[in-house]
């Protein structure tokens, strides 16, 4: 769980920026998007195969 403690002289904007940064580093939103819908094993394999092809093309270019 991501927590941010606010200092005495710290503004809410800077605390919110730190919170957003921690959430993005932890990959919480990406994980939430991946688990939004159930994905069968076949769908996972297809998605990973497409990603591998895309990465291979990108590395060749």
UniProtKB/Swiss-Prot annotation:
InterPro entries, per the entry: Ribosomal_bS21 (IPR001911), Ribosomal_bS21_CS (IPR018278), Ribosomal_bS21_sf (IPR038380)
Superkingdom, taxonomy of origin: Bacteria
HAMAP family: Ribosomal_bS21
The UniProt record lists the keyword RNA-binding: no
Any Gene Ontology CC annotation: ribosome
Protein's name in the database: Small ribosomal subunit protein bS21
Gene Ontology BP terms: translation
UniProt signal peptide: none
Family: Belongs to the bacterial ribosomal protein bS21 family.
GO MF term set: structural constituent of ribosome
Keywords: Ribonucleoprotein, Ribosomal protein
